[in-house]
Amino acid sequence: MNAEKPPVAHNVDLEEIAKFEAVASRWWDTEGEFKPLHRINPLRLGYIAERAGGLFGKKVLDVGCGGGILSESMAREGANVTGLDMGAEPLAVARLHALESGVELNYVQQTVEEHAAQHAGAYDVVTCMEMLEHVPDPRSVVQACAQLVKPGGHVFFSTLNRNAKSWLMAVVGAEYVLRMVPKGTHDAKKFIRPSELLGWVDETPLEERHIIGLHYNPLTNRFKLAPGVDVNYMLHTQAKKPV
């Protein structure tokens, strides 16, 4: 697991990084602040693996990997995984957990734009989960992800829709009522409508393949993937192949 020095970063919100650095030591606590990520990880992993035609032997980049929950699970599926993040503390936690778990993967402290400049067309699969709403310029991230994937490769995004229901459920409900995540985790003004995300995708060689909602039922305390993208949603895109 190699470490690379972080570059001079531009598309970075230092306040957002600081929020996650402060709780990084508890990233792998399945009952702590990141419990929802642990709960939804099997759903995300299953969706990505199914839509990408399996992960075994594929070169995968996890953008905004944090403490490595998804990165490590994809590596366990046989993928050659690189996790990318700008948070030093989450990456330190990710590296330590991988070492203790005996999972081989690489973590890099670098912006996705910098990584794209060095590794264009290098990956079979690129994932960008719950990251777009935490950067100043999400459009730039989408463009970089498109540059990183091989022709015919797959890029997955997940984020939160911007509307009253999403604010009520993801901010008021999740942060203040149910206390599923720390207060201040989300800024509803930074949420992204599917039409906006698809507009950015249309500016790249990526094509939409599938979109699905991630739903939480507080009565059953269960998550599921189902139609309806009014709160959380996942988007599967694929890079065009040369004609």
Swiss-Prot record:
Disulfide bonds: none annotated. It is an enzyme of class 2 (transferase). S-adenosyl-L-methionine binds at residues 44, 64, 85, 129. Keywords: Methyltransferase, S-adenosyl-L-methionine, Transferase, Ubiquinone biosynthesis. GO terms for molecular function: 2-polyprenyl-6-hydroxyphenol methylase activity; 3-demethylubiquinol 3-O-methyltransferase activity; polyprenyldihydroxybenzoate methyltransferase activity. Its EC number is 2.1.1.222, 2.1.1.64. Gene3D superfamilies: Vaccinia Virus protein VP39. It holds the Pfam family Methyltransf_23. It catalyses: a 3-demethylubiquinol + S-adenosyl-L-methionine = a ubiquinol + S-adenosyl-L-homocysteine + H(+); a 3-(all-trans-polyprenyl)benzene-1,2-diol + S-adenosyl-L-methionine = a 2-methoxy-6-(all-trans-polyprenyl)phenol + S-adenosyl-L-homocysteine + H(+). GO terms for biological process: methylation. Pathway: Cofactor biosynthesis; ubiquinone biosynthesis. CDD domains: AdoMet_MTases. O-methyltransferase that catalyzes the 2 O-methylation steps in the ubiquinone biosynthetic pathway. Belongs to the methyltransferase superfamily. UbiG/COQ3 family. PANTHER family: METHYLTRANSFERASE, UBIQUINONE BIOSYNTHESIS O-METHYLTRANSFERASE, MITOCHONDRIAL. This is Ubiquinone biosynthesis O-methyltransferase. The lineage of its organism: Bacteria, Pseudomonadati, Pseudomonadota, Gammaproteobacteria, Enterobacterales. The gene is ubiG.
